[in-house]
Amino acid sequence: MKVAVAGGTGLLGRLVVQALSEMGDQPIVLARSQGVDLTSGAGVAAALVGCDAVVDATNIITVRRRPAVRFFESVTRHLLGGAHGAGVAHVVTVSIVGVDSVDYGYFLGKRRQEQLLATGLVPWTLLRATQFHEFAGEVVARGGLGPIVAVPEMLCQPVAAAEAAGCLARLVHDGPQGVALPIAGPQRLGMADMVRGYLRATGQRRNVVSFRFPGRTGAAMATGGLIPDEPFQLGETTFDAYLSGLAVDAQTAGSVR
């Protein structure tokens, strides 16, 4: 199958491309470097001609509602419009477990993405995933203030990004099914503990300070709103195993220096 991967240069998208290739598919990456601008729509229609399916793994790094909603709305509209015009038979999109219960900026963008997908003209499948293991590093990068890392109170059930990518690739072949079973990892952990583990594994000495978002949003994040409350697909890789890999990489890098 010829499968277009939107966001194919990002963390998840690269893994989706790899998974599709291993399954014998022909993935093509939709990216500015290939003359495709998903936010403006330039080049999207032409890039989708001849494609059997599209995987939407696009992402934006923001915690604010307006840029998140604007990004996911524009990208989703352009992808769905291009896919419909090109006769693409299936669009597979990834979202987040808990997107319905957390009224938080980024989540509102993903919620809008889901709404457009469900009301579009192209047959679709939606996979909701919990936070990826790599999210701990993103929190450190975004919440670091010198020797301190500010971490929101979040109860998570993190999953390996590679396992989510493999699931997306399989869903392409399964055909449109609407909302698929969500995927989550095997451990339930607080985000503060995840960040502390990440800091230890990467050899960083920094203090973790937790805070709670106000209102119902903060309560939902802290008390299980990001955990599946329905049957789900269980990932195999633990967060501890992910940290062990990071520690080995850090030691190897240190020995090379």
Question: Where do the language-model regions lie?
Answer:
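N-terminal Rossmann NAD(P)H-binding glycine-rich loop of SDR-like oxidoreductase domains
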Residues: 1-24
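SDR active-site strand-loop-helix element
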Residues: 6, 30, 57-58, 91-96, ...
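Short-chain dehydrogenase/reductase
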Residues: 6, 69-73, 103-111, 154-162, ...
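Mid/C-terminal beta-alpha module of Rossmann-like enzyme folds, strongest
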Residues: 10-11, 19, 162-257
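NAD(P)H-binding glycine-rich loop region in Rossmannoid oxidoreductase-like domains
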Residues: 25-86, 96-102
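Conserved beta-loop-beta element that borders a ligand/cofactor-binding pocket
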Residues: 87, 95, 100, 112-135, ...
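A conserved pocket-lining segment of Rossmann-fold NAD(P)-dependent short-chain dehydrogenase/reductase
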Residues: 125, 138-159, 163
